[in-house]
Amino acid sequence: MVFNLFRISADLVHLLSIYFLLTKIISHKNCIGISLRSQILFFIVWVTRYLDIFYNFYSLYNTILKIVYLTTSAYTIYLISKRFRATYDKIHDTLNVWYLIVPCIVLAFIFTEDYSITEICWTFSIFLEAVAILPQILLLRSTGEVENLNSQYIFCLGLYRALYIINWIYRYATEQSYWSPLTWICGSIQTLLYVEYFYYYIKSRVEGTKFVLP
């Protein structure tokens, strides 16, 4: 694998977001403020994107990341739905995920470059990742105040996507054959979903106040 500082930085920030999420749930022994629906969507993203994990070896780095994303995502769902189920805020976590999944399936069949199962699933995962955070954002909007570790988790998720945009720009400038408009568009949409969140997160840090969404 060619060393790419921007991609590695993005991946490290993504891992940091997972650390914040699991630390919040395990150390506080609750999943208050965490959307189970978003976590399920992210798990679907990783499963459909990494169908080739058992037969397509690109690099040890890539394989380790795939395993980490799959296992931590499944573990997070277990913690929310089983171990700390009594603290799950199902009253506010109400977005119907099928409103996100079905359009992504349709778009995957329209925009896939190859009608193989792995390619259709990969394309589907790109679309779904762009909107998987929506249940989480809507849950936080409905409750208002955001816990510290929750805010760090979501901030890192947004930063990870922003760093990937820089990575794409870098690759486009340095690799002649690099062309991935679908990834760029979906990744940009995903990053835009975090813009308002970034604003209020940074504002609360600068002012030393609690992080509250309007």
UniProtKB/Swiss-Prot annotation:
Keywords: Endoplasmic reticulum, ER-Golgi transport, Membrane, Protein transport, Receptor, Transmembrane, Transmembrane helix, Transport. Residues 1-4, 56-63, 113-119, 171-181 are lumenal. GO terms for biological process: protein retention in ER lumen; protein transport; vesicle-mediated transport. It is a multi-pass membrane protein. GO terms for cellular component: cis-Golgi network; endoplasmic reticulum; endoplasmic reticulum membrane. Residues 24-37, 83-98, 140-151, 203-214 are cytoplasmic. Signal peptide: none annotated. It is found in: Endoplasmic reticulum membrane. GO terms for molecular function: ER retention sequence binding. The chain crosses the membrane at residues 5-23, 38-55, 64-82, 99-112, 120-139, 152-170, 182-202. Required for the retention of luminal endoplasmic reticulum proteins. Determines the specificity of the luminal ER protein retention system. Also required for normal vesicular traffic through the Golgi. Belongs to the ERD2 family. This is ER lumen protein-retaining receptor.
